[in-house]
Amino acid sequence: MLSIPPYYRVKNCNLIVDCQYGSTGKGLLAGYLGALEAPQVLCMAPSPNAGHTLVEEDGTARVHKMLPLGITSPSLERIYLGPGSVIDMDRLLEEYLALPRQVELWVHQNAAVVLQEHRDEEAAGGLAPGSTRSGAGSAFIAKIRRRPGTLLFGEAVRDHPLHGVVRVVDTRTAQDMLFRTRSIQAEGCQGYSLSVHHGAYPYCTARDVTTAQLIADCGLPYDVARIARVVGSMRTYPIRVANRPEAGEWSGPCYPDSVECQFADLGLEQEYTTVTKLPRRIFTFSAIQAHEAIAQNGVDEVFLNFAQYPPSLGALEDILDAIEARAEVTYVGFGPKVTDVYHTPTRAELEGLYARYRR
């Protein structure tokens, strides 16, 4: 017997996942698809140890840790943060009030909450290399331990200014809303190769980073998730979080068909991490990483970002060929803005775009 209710209205659902180490441009892709496909509901399971960036047309950079960046959607009605979220309530309120247009904000009652005690615990040290010390890991562990007195979002928000701004919902209410929504977009956090299950342990994050986990953390019902299109985000030169030599920390290895290089060697300005503001490490493209991520995440289409980074058009085409052995590259990005993303450019068009942006 089908579980789909008679009022099921979902026509399309886009899931955005990162196929590398994060910072591939998921926020840019989310903004682009939000404007292009106009979802009514945005879903996310955020954590304060990961940030998304969207550069608006006027050059203003919008950095979110708690809210998705598909807010460019002209049809947006509601943002829903699922039960797998780890919420920094102060940051959530700050981002919500800064939105260009206030829409309904729903948060699942069972989302974890970062409290000062969690930040203090992580500030004391003893964490994995690359930790942002945001309190996210400690908050998540506190939820899993299920000790008496542990506060989840539904209780914690009662004494916070968010109370009255946000709608706290249970699973049934969220399901009913999602089933009645025509178009949904869900944004993943971090990157596949940082997954605690699939990454280079212990040089990883505290949770799984796959399409399956995104679906679970957002609380998407199976009958919604099974029609989803998965768009995987990649960059021509993947990056990792910075080393912290003063603390004796190394952020981990790369794939065997990849080598570490320097931004200066590529003629590029140094990049810095969104959350910790530390210099990023950069590597050559790994086909092994791309193929593994595509298979594990069920990627249907790929967004390839920073297409102007390779030293020649031929080098860019080699990367495209490696990806398209497994999945179609549907979107190509050449810059930080939504207007720098191109949908299904031909190889001839790519030649002109590469020449223009490479200058």
From Swiss-Prot:
Binding residue positions for Mg(2+): S23, G51, T274
Classification via Pfam families: Adenylsucc_synt
Binding site for L-aspartate: T274, V275, R280
Keyword list, A-Z: ATP-binding, Ligase, Magnesium, Metal-binding, Nucleotide-binding, Purine biosynthesis
HAMAP family membership: Phage_PURZ
InterPro entries reported for this sequence: Adenylosuccinate_synth_dom1, Adenylosuccinate_synthetase, P-loop_NTPase, Phage_PurZ
Positions of the catalytic residues: S23 (proton acceptor)
Residues the record lists as binding ATP: S23, T24, G25, K26, G27, G51, H52, T53, Q190, N305, Q308
GO process terms (BP): 'de novo' AMP biosynthetic process; IMP metabolic process; purine nucleotide biosynthetic process
Protein's UniProt keywords contain Metal-binding: yes
Pathways per UniProt: Purine metabolism
Descriptive protein name: N6-succino-2-amino-2'-deoxyadenylate synthase
EC number assigned by the record: 6.3.4.25
Entries under PANTHER family matching the protein: ADENYLOSUCCINATE SYNTHETASE
Enzyme class: ligase
Catalytic reactions of this protein: dGMP + L-aspartate + ATP = (2S)-2-amino-2'-deoxyadenylo-succinate + ADP + phosphate + 2 H(+)
Organism: Cyanophage S-2L (Cyanobacteria phage S-2L)
Function: Involved in the synthesis of the atypical nucleotide dZTP (2-amino-2'-deoxyadenosine-5'-triphosphate). Catalyzes the condensation of aspartate with deoxyguanylate into dSMP (N6-succino-2-amino-2'-deoxyadenylate), which undergoes defumarylation and phosphorylation respectively by host PurB and guanylate/nucleoside diphosphate kinases to give dZTP. dZTP is integrated into the viral genome instead of adenine by the viral DNA polymerase. This Z-base probably completely replaces adenosine and forms a triple bond to the opposite T-base. The resulting non-standard viral DNA is called Z-genome.
Cofactor(s) demanded: Mg(2+)
Binding-site list for dGMP: S23, N49, S131, T132, R146, T205
Family: Belongs to the Caudovirales PurZ family.
Gene Ontology molecular function: adenylosuccinate synthase activity; ATP binding; magnesium ion binding
